[in-house]
C-alpha cells in the first residue's frame, strides 16, 4: 500500500514539473546526472498522517526532498540544493503565465525549494522546469527589484499579456515577496541553519550598480558599499589610489608639503620617504602600462625589471615614525596596516604568524586583492626581534631570528597563501593568494644604544664624534639628542648586523632613514601647528560642551620642558595634558546654568608648574562672560591663544 502511494505522488510530481515553464530567470541550473546516493532523502510529513488514513483525517501532505550539489550562482562555491514539493501561494512572480489555459488549472502547485549558500550567505529560491534531468531557475531572495523578474527565455506576446493580467495590483508582487521571505525563514529553520546576513542593495550611484541588472559584480562585497557621503577621495574605500592615480600621482615635493601639515621637523626623513613612495608607485604604474600595451619594446633596455625598495626608520620614541607612515598611506589612498613585531613568532609556535599581517591588510582593503597588493605595511618595534646573543641556551629563537627569517620572502616579494578566516594555515582550509612584490614595507624601531655600535665602528674614540660620546657615557650614561642624531645619520648595514639583525634581513631594506629627537621648540609647535595638533583636539573636545579652552604661551613652554624631561617625545605631551585637564573634564558634563555654568578652562603657568606633585589642575571660569573678563584683566603682548575655527577646521593664533 505504501509503495502504491509513493508511486502516485511521484507521477503527480513529474507531471506538474514537466508543465512548468519559468517566468523569472536569474540563474539557470542543468544537472545531467546526480549520484544515486544523493537521489532520495525522505523526511516525515509536517502534518502527520500515514498512507492508510481514514475518512476522519485529511489527506496528508508529504514533502519529499531531493538533494543535489550545484555551484552557487554568486560565489561559484558548492552548495546543497534541496528540491521539494512544498506548496507555496500562487502569484505572478512564480506562477507560469499560461496557467489558466493549462490542464488542471485548479491545482496550481508551484514546486519550490528555498536554499542557502553557506559560503556567501546568500539565499535562493529554486523553480524547477524539469526533473529528469533536473533543470530550473534560481531566484535570489531579497534582491528582486521588481514584481516581475527578467527572463532569458523568449515568450510570446500572448503570454506577456496574460502575465500583465496577473499583476494588475502593483503591490501584489511586493506582498508576495514578503510572504516568500517569511516562508523562507520557516523552511531555513527546519533545516537547522543560521539566517544569512542582511545585505542591502548598493545605492544607485555606487560603482557596483554600473553592471547590467542581471549580473553580479566580481570582487565586490556588499559590505564595501558605503552609502554615507564622503567629503574627499581619501576616505573613499570604493576607489583606491596608489598606482591607480596614474599621472595624477603627487610628486615628491607635493608629498613633502602634505607631510609638513601633520609632522613637525624631520625634514630629511620627509624627503627620503617622499622619493621612496613616489618611485614605488611609479614603478607599479609603468609596469602595468607595459603589460597592457601590445607593442614590443624596440630596445632591450626597456625590458629592465624594477625591484621595490623597502624602508627602515630609526629614531627615538615619539619622533614621528608611525605618524609619517600613516600620513603617507592616507595621502596616496592605499590600504595601510600597522603590525607589532613583538607579537610575531615563527610558524608552528604560539603567537601570530607573518601571514597574519597580510590578512589584516586584506581586511582593511575590504578583501579587494588588487588594492591589498598595493598597500603599505608598517612593522613597528622591529628592533625587538634581534637575535639573542650566543650563550649556553640551545633552544630555538622563535621570536627573534626566526621571525626575521620568516619575513625575508615576504619583504622581497612572493605569493603567500593567506588563510581566509585569519586562522593558522590548514591543509583543507580556504586560502587567498596575495603577491607581495608591490607591497611597500616600512619597518621602524627605536634602536636604543645603536650609537654605541657606530662609535665602536668608527674607531675614533679620542677625537671627533667619539670624544663627546665617550665622555657623556662615562659621566651620565646618556648621550645628548643632538650627538645621537648625528651618529644615527651615518648608520650602515654593518652596524645593524652587529646590533642583532641578520644580514639577509638588513639587505631587504636599501633605504635607511634616521629620525632625530624633537627639540623643545618643536614640541611647542606639535601642540599648536599641525592639523591634528593636541591643542586643537582638546579645544574641539571642550567645544562639544560649549566650553572654551585657552593655553598661555608660558604654559606651553613649561609643558614642552616637562615632556623633554620624560624623554618620551611627542607622546609625553598627551599624558601631561590629560593630567592637567582631568579635573576640568570631570566637572564640565554637569549641566548647570547661571553663575555655576562653566564658561572656559584656562591652562596657565600656575596650572603647569606643579605638575610633578600631581596637584596641578587647569583653572575653571564659571558664569557668563567669565572668559572675556579674564582676557581683559590678563591682557599681555606675549600671550597667544591657539583657536580652532570649527567651520573650516583650520588653526589660527589670535593676539590677546
Curated annotation (Swiss-Prot):
SUPFAM superfamilies per UniProt: P-loop containing nucleoside triphosphate hydrolases
Annotated localization: Mitochondrion
Transit peptide feature, positions: 1-44
Compositional bias ranges of the Polar residues kind: 216-226
GO cellular component, one term: mitochondrion
Compositional bias segments (type: Basic and acidic residues): 634-649
N-terminal signal peptide: none
Disordered, as annotated region: 142-177, 193-235, 634-656
Role this protein plays: ATP-dependent specificity component of the mitochondrial Clp protease. It directs the protease to specific substrates. Can perform chaperone functions in the absence of ClpP.
Entry protein name: CLP protease regulatory subunit CLPX3, mitochondrial
Encoding gene per record: CLPX3
Amino acid at each position: 500500500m505504501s509503495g502504491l502511494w509513493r508511486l502516485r505522488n511521484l507521477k503527480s510530481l513529474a507531471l506538474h514539473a514537466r508543465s512548468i515553464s519559468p517566468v523569472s530567470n536569474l540563474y539557470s541550473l542543468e544537472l545531467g546526472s546526480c549520484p544515486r546516493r544523493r537521489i532520495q532523502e525522505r523526511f516525515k510529513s509536517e502534518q502527520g498522517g500515514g498512507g492508510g488514513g481514514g475518512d476522519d483525517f485529511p489527506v496528508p501532505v508529504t514533502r519529499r526532498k531531493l538533494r543535489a550539489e550545484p555551484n552557487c550562482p554568486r560565489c561559484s562555491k558548492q552548495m546543497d540544493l534541496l528540491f521539494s514539493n512544498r506548496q507555496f501561494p500562487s502569484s505572478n512572480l512564480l506562477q507560469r503565465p499560461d496557467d489558466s489555459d493549462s490542464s488542471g488549472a485548479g491545482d496550481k502547485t508551484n514546486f519550490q525549494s528555498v536554499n542557502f549558500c553557506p559560503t556567501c550567505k546568500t539565499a535562493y529560491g529554486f523553480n524547477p522546469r524539469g526533473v529528469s534531468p533536473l533543470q530550473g531557475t534560481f531566484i535570489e531572495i531579497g534582491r528582486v527589484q521588481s514584481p516581475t523578474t527578467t527572463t532569458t527565455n523568449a515568450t510570446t506576446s500572448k503570454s506577456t499579456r496574460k502575465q500583465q493580467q496577473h499583476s494588475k495590483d502593483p503591490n501584489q508582487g511586493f506582498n508576495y515577496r514578503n510572504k516568500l521571505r517569511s516562508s523562507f525563514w520557516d523552511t531555513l529553520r527546519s533545516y537547522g541553519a543560521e539566517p544569512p546576513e542582511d545585505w542591502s542593495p548598493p545605492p544607485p550611484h555606487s560603482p557596483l550598480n554600473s553592471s547590467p541588472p542581471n549580473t553580479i559584480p566580481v570582487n565586490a562585497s556588499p559590505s564595501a558599499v558605503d552609502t554615507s557621503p564622503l567629503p574627499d577621495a581619501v576616505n573613499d574605500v570604493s576607489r583606491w589610489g596608489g598606482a591607480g592615480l596614474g599621472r595624477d600621482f603627487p610628486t615628491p615635493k607635493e608629498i613633502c608639503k602634505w607631510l609638513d601639515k601633520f609632522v613637525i621637523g624631520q625634514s630629511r626623513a620627509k624627503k627620503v620617504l617622499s622619493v621612496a613612495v613616489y618611485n614605488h608607485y611609479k614603478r607599479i604604474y609603468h609596469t602595468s602600462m607595459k603589460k597592457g600595451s601590445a607593442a614590443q619594446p624596440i630596445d632591450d633596455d626597456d625590458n629592465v625589471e624594477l625591484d621595490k625598495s623597502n624602508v627602515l626608520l630609526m629614531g627615538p620614541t615619539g619622533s614621528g615614525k608611525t605618524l609619517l607612515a600613516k600620513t603617507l598611506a592616507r595621502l596616496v589612498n592605499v590600504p595601510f596596516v600597522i603590525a607589532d613585531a613583538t607579537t610575531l613568532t615563527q610558524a608552528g609556535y604560539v603567537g601570530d604568524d607573518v601571514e597574519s599581517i597580510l590578512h589584516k591588510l586584506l581586511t582593511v582593503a575590504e578583501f579587494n586583492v588588487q588594492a591589498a597588493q598595493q598597500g603599505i605595511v608598517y612593522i613597528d618595534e622591529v628592533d625587538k626581534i634581534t637575535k639573542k646573543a650566543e650563550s649556553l641556551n640551545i633552544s630555538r629563537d622563535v621570536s627573534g631570528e626566526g621571525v626575521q627569517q620568516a619575513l625575508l620572502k615576504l619583504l622581497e616579494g612572493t605569493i603567500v597563501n593567506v588563510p581566509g578566516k585569519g586562522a593558522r594555515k590548514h591543509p583543507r582550509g580556504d586560502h587567498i593568494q596575495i603577491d607581495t612584490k608591490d607591497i611597500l614595507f616600512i619597518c621602524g624601531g627605536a634602536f636604543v644604544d645603536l650609537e654605541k655600535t657606530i662609535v665602536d665602528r668608527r674607531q675614533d674614540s679620542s677625537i671627533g664624534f667619539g670624544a663627546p660620546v665617550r665622555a657623556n657615557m662615562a659621566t651620565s650614561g646618556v648621550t645628548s639628542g643632538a650627538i645621537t642624531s648625528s651618529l644615527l645619520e651615518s648608520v650602515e648595514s654593518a652596524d645593524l648586523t652587529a646590533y642583532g639583525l641578520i644580514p639577509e634581513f638588513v639587505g631587504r631594506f636599501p633605504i635607511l632613514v634616521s629620525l632625530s629627537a624633537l627639540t623643545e621648540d618643536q614640541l611647542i609647535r606639535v601642540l599648536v601647528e599641525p592639523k591634528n595638533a593636541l591643542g586643537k583636539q582638546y579645544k574641539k573636545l571642550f567645544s562639544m560642551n560649549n566650553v572654551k579652552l585657552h593655553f598661555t604661551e608660558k604654559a606651553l613652554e613649561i609643558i614642552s620642558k616637562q615632556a623633554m624631561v620624560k624623554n618620551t617625545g611627542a607622546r609625553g605631551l598627551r599624558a601631561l595634558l590629560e593630567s592637567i585637564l582631568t579635573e576640568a573634564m570631570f566637572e564640565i558634563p554637569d549641566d548647570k546654568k547661571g553663575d555655576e555654568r562653566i564658561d572656559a578652562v584656562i591652562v596657565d603657568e600656575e596650572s603647569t608648574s606643579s605638575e610633578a606633585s600631581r596637584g596641578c589642575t587647569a583653572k575653571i571660569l564659571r558664569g557668563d562672560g567669565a572668559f572675556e573678563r579674564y582676557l581683559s584683566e590678563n591682557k599681555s603682548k606675549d600671550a597667544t591663544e591657539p583657536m580652532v575655527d570649527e567651520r573650516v577646521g583650520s588653526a589660527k593664533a589670535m593676539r590677546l
